[in-house]
Amino acid sequence: MPKILFIGLGTMGYPMAGHLSHGNDVTVYNRSRLKADNWIKEYKGNLITNLSELNDPFDYIISCVGNDNDLEEITISSFGCFKNLNSETVFIDHSTVSPKIVKLINKEAIKLGIQFLDAPISGGEAGAINGALSIMVGGNLSSFEKSREVLQSYGKKNQIYGGFRIRTTNKNYKSNLYCWFSAGLSRSSSLHEEN
């Protein structure tokens, strides 16, 4: 049974970690202790309160945090988990962050011998709840293949796109297209109502 640490129990992360709790040994971490306590009551799993003191080896560490600063804090800061990981652990990040931070995290992962997959998600809260997210993965093919079954716990469509900055750019491009489309549709509706 794979040992998984899931970091970030927000709107997306909470149900994603819930899917993983079926058939895996899941431990969760969240800055807000209340959310983590609620997750433990709802699903089968364990809780940790300090990432910098990890001493139990995990097969996978999965993060879904809010922004660049959050990702840096949980990985490479003095409070982060990277310094305690070994080369067998695959770190999968689902956060929507900048290419700059992904490049920095990947550089540190290589230096420390950590397998890192940059894997943004799309599909919204409903996709997370229903286990039907689309996942665009950047990183090493063998790490992706090793992680495929874990990703399928909450992802309906999982594809590797190659380099780290490629997938981040794809996610940002897709988000921008959606915004432009929505704005255009809204403007068209208002023009129609005016006429």
Ranges and model annotations:
Residues 97-176:
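Rossmann-fold dinucleotide-binding core
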Residues 51-115:
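Rossmann-fold NAD(P) dinucleotide-binding segment
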Residues 1-63, 89, 125:
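NAD(P)+-binding Rossmann beta1-loop-alpha1 motif at the extreme N-terminus of oxidoreductases
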